[in-house]
């Protein structure tokens, strides 16, 4: 039933988009379009990996903004919400524990989408549990999340929080066998997590990572 509901929403979204006059589509903001595409892509996860994995998406809370837009507002100092995808092999035995892979997506102002489905399938086939955070600055959630980017900063904390969420809330996750992997910007987040929390990860892989943030920002 859940899958049918998602498919119905997918069809409605596509039909609405296709039925809009060209001038109306052109007036859609970039963030509105990103949000629409995100909803569609979330449905596609079930098509891409749903045969071998349980797919879920949760809302987590990371640290407050590094610099508040309005320090005197009532919301100043509040934690920031972000989303994280969870992929669990359908073959798991609930009486056993399995290794966890933390998988930060690549790209500045990008997101975790089905572009990575082939990687998720490979990890699931080897019975890894995967958590992939859409950390602050990711696209698909509107201008608020987008503008809260903290390049090389608190985005690393968001990813670490996704790791802790899995270890603390899933009995089938082996907290002593946690790895982290990512490419490009995700590779940088991988390195930062390994440096900042060396005792929390058994291994890591950083593919073509940003390794000098000062040079990159300069």
Roles of regions detected by a PLM:
Residues 1-5, 9-61:
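N-terminal targeting or regulatory segments adjacent to alpha/beta-hydrolase or S9 domains
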Residues 5, 169-170, 197-198:
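Acidic-histidine catalytic/liganding microenvironments
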Residues 42-46, 70-71, 115-119, 190-193:
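Short beta-alpha junctions and helix-cap segments that line functional grooves
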Residues 52-83, 87-176, 181-183:
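Cap/lid segment of the alpha/beta-hydrolase catalytic domain
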Residues 83, 103, 189-192, 203:
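Residues within well-formed alpha-helices
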Residues 142, 191-218:
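Hydrolase active-site cap/lid region
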Residues 182-186, 190:
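Gly/Ala-rich beta-loop-alpha elbow adjacent to hydrolase catalytic centers
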